[in-house]
Each structure stands twice: as structure tokens, then as C-alpha cells.
A protein has these predicted regions:
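Short beta-strand/loop motif that positions the catalytic acidic residue
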Residues: 278, 284-286, 290
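Conserved alpha/beta-hydrolase "acid-adjacent" motif
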Residues: 291-297
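Acidic beta-to-alpha connecting loop that harbors the catalytic carboxylate
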Residues: 288-290, 319, 560
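Cap/lid segment of the alpha/beta-hydrolase catalytic domain
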Residues: 40-140, 146-147, 326-338, 501-503, ...
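N-terminal cap/lid segment of alpha/beta-hydrolase-fold proteins
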Residues: 1-43, 469-471
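Accessory cap/linker subdomain of secreted extracellular hydrolases
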Residues: 70, 85, 99-102, 108-144, ...
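C-terminal, loop-rich substrate-recognition/catalytic regions characterized by aromatic stacking residues
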Residues: 332-333, 337-591
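Catalytic histidine neighborhood in serine/cysteine hydrolases
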Residues: 305-331
Length: 591
């Protein structure tokens, strides 16, 4: 690594679309710049723009800034709008607000304008305030202040990349980690009636994730209070969020599902709805352990980009918003470290470095397979590369089908299906009878063992299990379920709208020989059935999981879940086992 010069407390005042009243607004941005000491007008380097995840700040990317500056990049790390110490309200990575603001930073990195800073460290010598003009980046078009530039960041810092690239063609490549495709699905999923990707039909709204939405608003409001001195107006009206966000939260809290007004916001801030404007090579990285932005979101973005001929690769890493694998709250050992001298010693760190070197420096290095995924059952030492399997594209493997039979069995042949029925009901009044997780806390903080054990209350769910497996089954991808529900009571209420429609939560358990059960990464699949008289196709969460020999795979259809807004009315429901038209569970399996 080469020596790095730093400029901290860079201050920008940039245009950022319109405020809640439709008036043009400017916002302040706080940033730090990391520069290779040798970079200059005669030794120009590519640029990287990065920002924080939700509730974070520029400081979160300091390690990345130092690491990549030491490898020949100028890195600008900034605090996103609405977070301390940048101004304006949180607008959820809106291309017309956050994307416009980021575009001004692209201009700065292309030599357009200057920015004051509070301190510097150049060649190991600390300095006081000054003004910085960038004259050390590679320019693709000097007249348009167009630097050779890539973006990287996770979660909220992932979506901003799409928002910026959609507004600014000067961005050359993206590396978004653990971010969303469609926020309507992320915050209120419905895993049936999917029109495309994870985007469900407006007429088939999802079910609110009460844990995640509550956590986000709490964090955002707290950030507004902490940053009040920077921009007191951010706490006026809807506290530290654009007005539409408060309105959407009120709708979700009241109804438990989104409406057309909610969609106007979520569609505007989701790449699913403007992906035709994203045309640059993209390296998607998504987390296997993530109940906020699950693997289906990355698949939706991957497929949309690939269908339009945009170069795209996808990796599924071990960790996400819900923690890591085993005792790790973050990346597995040797998987990802972007903070120092050991980038090349981690599987994804090396791939990201090579990606930028190839896309921004033109280096003839491998950018890796189009699809790769972490397998937590593979032992290794050092780099996590041995734990990653790869493929030339997604999906992978073949599908195996089990049919729902009587006696709560899953069988592999239609002929083996025995007639019967399984019935259950929710408690009503919105009360949960099943538990999957404490959203946002599990995997991040230590919780009592009993608190983290998923459960389903007898009489409120249906379950079907395979016999003990004779050999391991490796599941990679999204299982699906085709099923017909029978609920005369709901058939009478569903015409009244979403509140009268059947709610079901589908999930897969790994059942050990001793009867203990594992809900893989606490992932479940909420479904709101628009018409209970018609067959339903359900997409369960994508997983990467080995079901060991001697274990059983169990499908559960629950009436409620404590992490979601549940039905108020009592909804008795039955699934009939029929040899002529059995419900079918399809599992993607790799050798």
C-alpha cells in the first residue's frame, strides 16, 4: 500500500431536488477525501464515491477509504442526507433528491469546483483548514468534469448507487451490497401475485414488517435530533423524514398493508421502477442471513439488468442485516474485509478490488464468476474462497418436488399422496401465535436463548415433513409452493379488500433427528391471498442450506408471525391433500 493523504470535514452545499412543499432545496454534505500521496495532475487516479448505511455516517467508510486510496484510488466518503452531519431530511435514496445531491460530488471529483475542509494530513503532517480542488483524478471528459468513477456501499449506501447512476451517466460502475430492489416488498412483502421480480401487483398488497419499519423510523428520528444543529428544519413536520415517509408509516401502522399513496413513494425510491436507466457494470452482493433485504431482491435486480444486456455479476455472502453465520455478527472469517492491508486475503475483498481494477483501471484481471454463493457447511482456513461455489449464471441446480399428503407428510410421488386435510386458524385481533425473530437485533446483539427460538402455537399452523433424508440435500435458491386453500369464511370477506383477505406465512424448517428445528436464517414468506377460491403460487425466501442426512425438511404454513402485522379477523383455513391435484413444494437442489 502507498501512503495516503486525508482531507477531513469537506463541506459541500449542493442542489437536491425539491422539499416537501415542492420548493427547490439545497443541502449541506459532510465528507472526507482519501488520496494516494503520489496522485497529482501528472499521475491521475480513478475515483470511488461511497456513503453510509442507514443511521451511519462517513466515518463508517474510513477504513475503506484508506484501503483503496492505498491501492491507487481517490476515495470520497460522505454522510448521506438526513444523517449527522449532513443536512436535509431522509428521502430514502430518491434519485430526484439523493441522486441529484450525489451528482454534485461526482462533479467535484471531476475537477469541477472547490470545497473547504477542516483539517488535513498530507505526507504525515497535520494541517488546519483549507480549500481543496481535485486535479488528480482520471478524466473521461474534462469539459463535463467526468471522472473515471465507481461507487460502493451497503444497504442504504447500496441503493444510492442506483439512484446516482440513473441520474448521472458519468458513473462508470457499481458495487452495491445488501440493498433493496423494491421497497414495497422489503417493508411489506407479498410473496404471491408477483408481477415481476419481487414487485407485487398494486391490487395485492403485502404485510407490514412491524419490527423493521419501527426500527428504521426510530433510528431516523434519533439522527435528526443528533443533527439538529446542522439543519434544525429537518425536525419540523415529519421528523427527519420527507412527509411521504411519515404518511406511509402511518398507513402501514393503521392498515398493516400499503396503499397507492405508499406505492408512489416506494416506487420512486426503488431501482425496480427505474432500472432501465441503470446501464453500467454492476457487482451485486447480497446477504444470505437477511430478513430485511433478502436474496430475492438481488435476484430481481440481477435478472432485470441481465435481460437488458448490462454486465452484472452476483455473489451471495454469508452475512446481512440479520447477522452472520455461526457466532459471527458480520462476515465469516476470510470472507470480506475492506478496511486495511488484508483486502486480498478475503474472498470478496479480492473480488471487489479486482472488479474496480478491471472496470476503472482497465487491468486484465479476473472479476470472478457471474454467480457465487457461500456454503456454511464447508470447512476452510484462511480465505473463504473454498466455501464459495460458483456458476456461470443464476439459477443453479435442478428442482425436486414433494407433494403434501395426509398425516402431515411430504411425499415424492403424486401416487403416494393420501387423501386428507389439515386445518388451522389465527387467534384474531392481530395477535401473533408464531415467532420468527426480533427484527434488527438478532445476530447483532446477545439475546437470551429462549427469545431467539422460533415457535408456532398448536392449532394455528399446518406442517408437512419429509421422511429422514438418506443423503444430504443442498438447497440453493427459492423454493416454491403451489397450493389451494379452503376458507369459506374468508371467501365471504375478501371482497372487502386486503383486510378481509387470507394471510399466510410460509417457511421451511430443518428438523434434526432429536426433533430440534432450525428456521433457516429466520426467513419466512408472508402471503396475502387475493382470492382464496383460486390456486396460489408462493415463492419462499431464497436460501443456501444443507439439510443433512437423517434430517427432515418441514414445510410450515402459519397464520401469523410476531414480526408482522397480523389479521384482525379470525381466518379458519384448510388445505386438502388430493392425489389428483396435490399441493406441490418445489426445491432447487445442487449436486
Amino acid at each position: 500500500m502507498q501512503p495516503v493523504d486525508t482531507y477531513t470535514g469537506l463541506h459541500f452545499t449542493v442542489p437536491a431536488g425539491n422539499d416537501d412543499l415542492g420548493r427547490p432545496q439545497t443541502c449541506t454534505i459532510d465528507a472526507d477525501l482519501y488520496k494516494p500521496h503520489s496522485a497529482g495532475p501528472a499521475a491521475r487516479v480513478p475515483a470511488i464515491l461511497t456513503t453510509n448505511g442507514f443511521g451511519g455516517s462517513k466515518a463508517d467508510q474510513a477504513g475503506l477509504g484508506m484501503a483503496f486510496a492505498g491501492r491507487g484510488y481517490a476515495v470520497l466518503s460522505y454522510t448521506g442526507l438526513g444523517f449527522p452531519d449532513s443536512g436535509c431530511k431522509i428521502s430514502l435514496d430518491d434519485p430526484g433528491v439523493d441522486g441529484v445531491a450525489a451528482s454534485s460530488l461526482v462533479t467535484f471529483l471531476g475537477g469541477g469546483g472547490t470545497a473547504p475542509y477542516s483539517s488535513s494530513d498530507v505526507a504525515g503532517a497535520a494541517g488546519g483548514p483549507g480549500t481543496l480542488e481535485v486535479d488528480f483524478t482520471v478524466l473521461d471528459d474534462a469539459a463535463n468534469h467526468d471522472p473515471r468513477l465507481g461507487m460502493i456501499g451497503g444497504s442504504y449506501g447500496g441503493q444510492i448507487q442506483f439512484a446516482t447512476a440513473a441520474r448521472d451517466s458519468r458513473v462508470d460502475t457499481l458495487v452495491p451490497l445488501i440493498t433493496w430492489n423494491d421497497l414495497r416488498y422489503s417493508l411489506a412483502p407479498n410473496n404471491t401475485s408477483l408481477a415481476r421480480g419481487v414487485t407485487y401487483a398494486d391490487s395485492a398488497p403485502g404485510t407490514q414488517k412491524i419490527g423493521w419499519t419501527g426500527l428504521f423510523f426510530g433510528v431516523g428520528i434519533l439522527d435528526g435530533l443528533q443533527g439538529a444543529a446542522v439543519d434544525p428544519a429537518r425536525n419540523v413536520g415529519c421528523p427527519n423524514f420527507v412527509l411521504e415517509a411519515c404518511q406511509a408509516k402511518a398507513t402501514l401502522d393503521t392498515l398493516g398493508y400499503p396503499t397507492s399513496d405508499t406505492y408512489q413513494l416506494t416506487d420512486r425510491v426503488s431501482v425496480a421502477h427505474y432500472i432501465d436507466k441503470v446501464t453500467v457494470p454492476t457487482f451485486l452482493i447480497q446477504g444470505e442471513n437477511d430478513t430485511l433485504f433478502n436474496l430475492q431482491e438481488s435476484v430481481a435486480t440481477y435478472r432485470s439488468l441481465k435481460a437488458r444486456g448490462v454486465p452484472v455479476t452476483m455473489a451471495w455472502q454469508s452475512w446481512g442485516h440479520s447477522g452472520g453465520t455461526g457466532d459471527n455478527t458480520g462476515a465469516a472469517p476470510g470472507e470480506l474485509d475492506l478496511t486495511g492491508q488484508h483486502i486480498e486475503d478475503t474472498y470478496l475483498g479480492l473480488r471487489i478490488r479486482n472488479w474496480f481494477d478491471h472496470q476503472l483501471k482497465g487491468s486484465k484481471v479476473s472479476t470472478g464468476p457471474e454467480f457465487a454463493y457461500f456454503r456454511d457447511w464447508v470447512p476452510y482456513t484462511g480465505t473463504a474462497a473454498p466455501a464459495y461455489a460458483s456458476a456461470s449464471s443464476y439459477p443453479v441446480g435442478t428442482r425436486r418436488t414433494w407433494y403434501l399428503s395426509s398425516a402431515d407428510d411430504l411425499v415424492t410421488s403424486r401416487k403416494a399422496v393420501l387423501p386428507g386435510s389439515t386445518s388451522w386458524s389465527n387467534p384474531g385481533l392481530g395477535a401473533p401465535a408464531s415467532y420468527s425473530e426480533v427484527s434488527g437485533l438478532e445476530g447483532q446483539v446477545s439475546l437470551p436463548a429462549g427469545v431467539t427460538t422460533p415457535y408456532d402455537t398448536p392449532g394455528t399452523f399446518g406442517a408437512w415433513s419429509t421422511p429422514p433424508l438418506s443423503s444430504p440435500v443442498d438447497v440453493v435458491g427459492s423454493p416454491t409452493l403451489d397450493v389451494q386453500f379452503d376458507s369459506p369464511a374468508v371467501a365471504l370477506t375478501q371482497a372487502a379488500g386486503p383486510s378481509g383477505q387470507l394471510q399466510v406465512f410460509a417457511k421451511l424448517y430443518d428438523v434434526a433427528p432429536d426433533g430440534s428445528k432450525t428456521l433457516v436464517h429466520k426467513l419466512i414468506s408472508p402471503v396475502r391471498v387475493a382470492d382464496v377460491t383460486q390456486p396460489v403460487h408462493i415463492e419462499l425466501p431464497a436460501i443456501v442450506h444443507r439439510v443433512d442426512a437423517g434430517h427432515r425438511l418441514q414445510l410450515v404454513l402459519a397464520s401469523t408471525d410476531a414480526a408482522y402485522k397480523n389479521a384482525y379477523a379470525v381466518q379458519p383455513v384448510t388445505v386438502h391433500a388430493s392425489p389428483t391435484s396435490p399441493a406441490a413444494l418445489s426445491i432447487p437442489v445442487v449436486p
